[in-house]
């Protein structure tokens, strides 16, 4: 006789599928209950991710003159390009290797952990791209041809920085996997690595410093939310974060 069907929507079905299928199913679950819209407080320049009726992440778009002022920083950091070129090229699509080096993460030994981290990264990409679309901020090279990025500038907005979102999310997830406190040496190293990955994107000429700050805010919040949806912590314990300060246009920072 043929094998009996499993129960409808049984979690054990996931073990039968390819990783990309599990990721697609997980993303559907993660995005459930989340909505995006202009912030009620400042709809002309702020955009937010809502869970129910509460804002989970709110980002304010810096004015154009602020980005112009930060061009000086982007151009000055270009001095580090020769030193960091190898890192910049490797980190285009592979951040986990750098942070995994802190924890001994191995794709063969830690297959399920790698798949779990990838689901978290795909979740981060889905959210960050919605913010980039909404806020529509131009890249450094669109303000000045003298920036001359050393790699191709991606065709999506500069703010927030996607690599920062993903780097800080991975740092938090690896900290949780390791069971390390916030002041543990490995946690500190993971945070430093996330900061360096973010800085490298500025050095490459792809981003402004403010993009990294907004990305950190988003990455840490999404990590908490992801962990809550995985049952690691209460969903109501996720801290809402915002980056809505008054930007100091004259100083560019």
Question: Residue ranges of each PLM-predicted region?
Answer:
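Membrane-embedded catalytic cores of phosphoryl/pyrophosphoryl-handling enzymes
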Residues: 133, 137-253
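N-terminal transmembrane-helix/juxtamembrane module of multi-pass inner/ER membrane proteins
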Residues: 1-113, 128-142
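Second-shell loop/turn segments in exported
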Residues: 114-118, 156-157
